[in-house]
């Protein structure tokens, strides 16, 4: 028994020794293996901090990849690098917007550049030696294998095998939108545009002596560029880049306006049209496949293709397209494209599609287009030129037909009548400071601010209800030794203490010097003020065509006729002297005189002063003072004066008034008590400081106006309104045929724009004074004979009138007015 026990102990001891020796041997082998891997890791072209932390599998993986790369490099004919090439090596990876990857025929990544971490978040040593199929989308594996396959079969004579590769690959990315890295298990897919070629390396020169011939080594060299998302583009787009958005059928839903400069298209004309209509036919197959990849993988880059320009030819474009998905149901919503135009228009004289012929073929001009061009041209034209155009296109005049309810004026363009009217127009000196620019000053007048629509065609101020009015218009257009002054004054909110002005000063106020003082400019805002019903009421006329310059033989006194009150409901017939007790309830300060009752309700808004009389202090008589060059220069100085200077404007009070002395049966009401109110707009220091003469109220608020006085005033206002309106209106109709280019609409509408100007500019915050330079025709008017009785002398009091608000309900009409006039006389 003892012997058997001793043998068992010996066996145990021997087995333990063997196990210990085995462990020691394994430990020794592992240590030697570790030393080998350590030495091998340090032979790799990797930083020490990276190679020292590699496991054995990684060392073997990287070593194999390194040997394969060396094999590729040895197989190629490499030149010895000089110092210049060695310095340029560091810039090669910065040129492409991506990283370099080399794959074997079985998909192993034997090389990948170190800047892959910048785009994918994965490091170089984590990818090198691994299979590309471990990091790509499963749906792309089949396409990836096709790209790696190189067919070595026979090739047709004269045709080389295509080794170029371009495809889109979805690869794992551990980068977040904020630039942080995540775990590989949580990685997302990023679309890479991979371009490169297949390289076949023949290694037969380095084969061993045994005679065994190794097969050539096939590698796929790629440059992988990630496609940026449109929402993450950090670099601002240059002028050669435009954005576009498309629906899922590739129709435009938005396009950047920069496409107009680059290709000639307007963004509006592209909306709703397919992008395929603008592709070159030779690139349609390539782009169709690209769009298929876009819907499959989410992003694509088209590469350079040809896109047709609008007026012929094409440009080279490269597009980055991204499918935008709905955040709720993850369904595709639209496509956003970033289009880079890489060339100018090539072969611009060639037509490639029907869309390009739209800009080449001359469109058929319709009568609408011709008439629009004819009556909206700003250049000046001769009368004969206009006559020839209208003679060739007589049917085009139907476009100027008035709206329903308007009066139709027949236009006769016969040669005899035209010559007769031209002769009459030459004999009539017209006020052309607003309607016509002076030939000496070359004033520029914008035609776009004056014309009215076709339904508001200007009409002569004539009335069948008052035939004597037509004679009065013609008589007042005759030459006159007297000149007229016209002033329309509107109050302003800010009040300043009134400066005293004695009666002698007002009596020495000079007469208006020239007819140009009747003419005044208006702003382009007046076009928006007119209404059709107001124009129809103001310019009611007879249906039969009459000569506006014809005069009747019988001399009728307008004061004995019923007053013609325009049915314009915008203003009241009020002046500074006759203010009713109702004005005492106005919210305006008592120191500010108002023009009309309508203006009193708008005193919270600053208004405008339009003054046509030039400022002067010289005492004049009834004899008119001719306009000289000195007067014109004085007016120019007033216009060019700096805004900070004070320009006093004194309203004239002519002694030889049209309604005083022998010119009228009733003298003008006493206007003693005028005072000059210095208006200084402190809120606008650059505005002119105007000194405007206003009439002081002498009426007691409790007393009522005498009906006789009202009737007399209405008759006077009616005469003045018809006289002033006839001047502008008759001149406008006559000159429409004389110079139709750019002045007739402005001239014929001047009187209407005066009334609208006061009401439309009440919303402005500044007070303006507009001076007009007298023109050559105004000088002709002053140079006429002084033998005949001509234009009556009107004062500022006579001109400060407007139309009533309540119409004729409170006014005397017909026989009642005649009886009131007889009692006054």
Curated annotation (Swiss-Prot):
Give residues where (3S)-3-hydroxyasparagine occurs. Answer: 802
Which residues, renumbered to this chain, carry the PTM Phosphoserine?
A: 247, 550, 575, 588, 657
Renumbered residue ranges of the record's region ODD: 401-602
Region labeled Required for heterodimer formation with ARNT — which residues? Answer: 170-191
Mark the residues carrying the PTM S-nitrosocysteine. 799
A Gene Ontology biological process in which this protein takes part is: muscle cell cellular homeostasis
| Gene3D superfamilies registered for this protein in UniProt | Helix-loop-helix DNA-binding domain (4.10.280.10), PAS domain (3.30.450.20)
Keywords per UniProt:
Acetylation, Activator, Cytoplasm, DNA-binding, Hydroxylation, Isopeptide bond, Nucleus, Phosphoprotein, Repeat, S-nitrosylation, Transcription, Transcription regulation, Ubl conjugation
Q: Domain PAS, which positions?
A: 85-158, 228-298
Q: Region entry Disordered: which residue ranges?
A: 1-30, 492-520, 579-602, 654-674
Residue ranges annotated as coiled coil are none
Record domain bHLH: where: 17-70
PANTHER family for this protein: HYPOXIA-INDUCIBLE FACTOR 1 ALPHA, HYPOXIA-INDUCIBLE FACTOR 1-ALPHA
Q: How does it assemble?
A: Interacts with the ARNT; forms a heterodimer that binds core DNA sequence 5'-TACGTG-3' within the hypoxia response element (HRE) of target gene promoters. Interacts with COPS5; the interaction increases the transcriptional activity of HIF1A through increased stability. Interacts with EP300 (via TAZ-type 1 domains); the interaction is stimulated in response to hypoxia and inhibited by CITED2. Interacts with CREBBP (via TAZ-type 1 domains). Interacts with NCOA1, NCOA2, APEX1 and HSP90.
Name of the protein this chain belongs to: Hypoxia-inducible factor 1-alpha
Gene name? Hif1a
